[in-house]
């Protein structure tokens, strides 16, 4: 949903080993990336449970950047804190085990809660970053991690959380969100950028 404005800035965001964030603007020679370190911005909780999560992660890490949650290692951090809050033993020891359990209906309901919480926080962060850069051209999610639980992601509170920005909710409602299903997006982008840099000189891959 949303309205595409082809001439406006776009936001690309992707949880993986960390949280990658960049902008894309159109130039006479094609799309140009605006690099940044958005994954290291502060995690801002919105609910009492999220405040509890922040408190536990602060004790562990000191500064809690959003990629402490929105990444593969972040899913592990989130699962660990939810187990602590609920006084439960950790059953799983890797992000892949957690997401697989959530998708397949495993025997630990906290795995499912972890993925749901991940999606909700991801929506909030993506919405904030879309407002920060003015991403009226759309938000593009590129993440092998999210594709591991695609159906859960689509049915999650991501979109609701993305749009829940008070007076700016109407702005977020008009920003389309896309999830790329292609793999190796980093490599594809690298090839495109090489072409983009040299196109004026007549080189082509």
Predicted regions and their residues:
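ATP-binding/phosphotransfer module of carbohydrate and carboxylate kinases, centering on a glycine-rich
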Residues: 28, 48, 52-205
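Eukaryotic endomembrane system proteins
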Residues: 30-40
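Gly/Ser/Thr-rich beta-alpha loop segments that engage phosphate groups in nucleotides
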Residues: 18-22, 41, 145-146
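Charged, low-complexity surface segments at secondary-structure and domain boundaries
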Residues: 38-44, 63
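Conserved phosphate-binding catalytic cores of ATP/NTP-utilizing and phosphoryl-transfer enzymes
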Residues: 1-10
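Short beta-strand scaffold segments in enzyme catalytic cores
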Residues: 11-14, 19-25
